[in-house]
Amino acid sequence: MLRFSSPVSHFKRTVMEDTIIRGQAIKAGERVVMFYGSANRDEDVFENPDTFDITRDPNPHVAFGAGGPHLCLGMHVARVELAVMFKELLSRMPLVQPDGAIERMHSSFIAGIHSMPVKY
């Protein structure tokens, strides 16, 4: 689910050494931006990347970062919170369905939902 709709839209990083990525030269000290939505729907990594499939395995998404020193410290807590939230929500409202337009947050950093009408 986090691969399909990442809560963080992008992160900016500083290039540590001169490098070339897909023919594009990038010099040390330059800033680059990684867009999570693009990385999490990369056709080279995910078969049918625009298909919502919670059984996808393996699922090497980068919703919590790509590893190393920038990996999200709270990712394990976030996964537990999501599991508990969905278990409780679905046990109380098993037939919950969308009932109107989703209103997204207006943010250049966080990709959240402001409101989402549902019916059950």
Task: For the regions a language model picked out, list residue spans one by one.
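Short, basic/aromatic-enriched C-terminal tail that caps enzymatic domains
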Residues: 111-120
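Cytochrome P450 heme-binding "Cys pocket" and the immediately downstream C-terminal segment
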Residues: 77-105
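Hydrophobic, well-ordered secondary-structure elements that form the walls
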Residues: 1, 26, 52, 68, ...
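Conserved cytochrome P450 K-helix/beta-meander segment immediately N-terminal to the heme-binding cysteine loop
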Residues: 35-59
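Conserved cytochrome P450 K-helix E-x-x-R motif and the immediately C-terminal K′/meander segment
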Residues: 1-24
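Short acidic/histidine-rich active-site segments
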Residues: 65
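Extended hydrophobic-aromatic, low-complexity segments
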Residues: 10-13, 29, 42-46, 62
